[in-house]
Amino acid sequence: MSRVTLSRYLIEQTRSHNTPADLRFLIEVVARACKEISHAVSKGALGGVLGSMGTENVQGEVQKKLDVMSNEILLEANEWAGNLAGMASEEMDHPYQIPGRYPKGAYLLVFDPLDGSSNIDVNVSVGTIFSVLRCPNEYLNQNDTLREEAFLQPGTTQVAAGYAIYGPQTMLMLTLGNGVKGFTLDRELGSFVLTHDNISVPESTAEFAINMSNQRHWEAPVKRYVEELLAGKEGPLGKNYNMRWIASMVADVHRILTRGGVFMYPRDAREPEKPGKLRLMYEANPMSFIIEQAGGAATNGTQRILDIKPENLHQRVAVFLGSKQEVERITGYHAE
């Protein structure tokens, strides 16, 4: 039986679910860029890509060399293809304008080029997160500068989302709004091959992911929930839980997507003016779309993440996502 490559899968989606051809091509271009990033990540010190650039991004975070390289790879791969009206990156202050020498398309691409890049130098799994939106008609004029407002759509409007994880294997997890598929990069073939079909997050779990060192800064509902988890079989939840924390959202969410669990990155008292740490557009929305399509849930503690209307490109948000039963429990604690 022949293996199903990403290209074949996307063609079959065009036939069975009327996936537009330009969206199919866009996903393939993003996947090719992810293969190039994977190659750069795997070379590590041999490629001279480790270490800091000595600059900061719009988030005030120190940029790693691979942050900048990954960002450039995604921009250069996608700017010429004619599928996009514009792009937005976690590493850039403003939307990226498609150069006038290239045709424009009907979609917007939003991405975190290298999530978890602080782990690069210690050889921990990192990844690329991306989200695809339709560009509103009023912003499609070929001659106008694309404004930030075109991107400020709730997560429910996403037409596709995915992430690539660069670990022992390079994998691409993808949703087009009809479930989640997992593809593994076959380096001999040079293609992503379907290896995980119809991924489903278990409703309940015995694992959780959170940075426990921040416990003293959490809000009361989060403290209560985690204390109940730690109480184990003798506590109110009646079972023992294991904690896992990699400090790379892609790696933590990938584990939860494949074997269940709950990922938590709550707001805390150190920066009370900020509603959270993670970026809504670049991280929370695409990951929430993927998790929901796999049968899980995602909230900011009080509201479904995909229902949040962004106010700016770099808006932050608290995140609780994963197994539905656990996410509903902690969301309920916030409501009390």
Curated annotation (Swiss-Prot):
Compartment(s) of residence: Cytoplasm
Native organism: Pseudomonas aeruginosa (strain ATCC 15692 / DSM 22644 / CIP 104116 / JCM 14847 / LMG 12228 / 1C / PRS 101 / PAO1)
Subcellular location, principal: cytoplasm
Name of this protein: Fructose-1,6-bisphosphatase class 1
HAMAP family on file: FBPase_class1
GO terms assigned for molecular function: fructose 1,6-bisphosphate 1-phosphatase activity; magnesium ion binding
One Gene Ontology cellular component annotation held by this UniProt entry: cytoplasm
Cofactor: Mg(2+)
Catalytic reaction list: beta-D-fructose 1,6-bisphosphate + H2O = beta-D-fructose 6-phosphate + phosphate
Gene Ontology biological-process annotations: fructose 1,6-bisphosphate metabolic process; fructose 6-phosphate metabolic process; fructose metabolic process; gluconeogenesis
Keyword annotations from UniProtKB, A to Z: Carbohydrate metabolism, Cytoplasm, Hydrolase, Magnesium, Metal-binding
Domain of life according to the entry: Bacteria
CDD domains assigned: FBPase
Biochemical pathway: Carbohydrate biosynthesis; gluconeogenesis
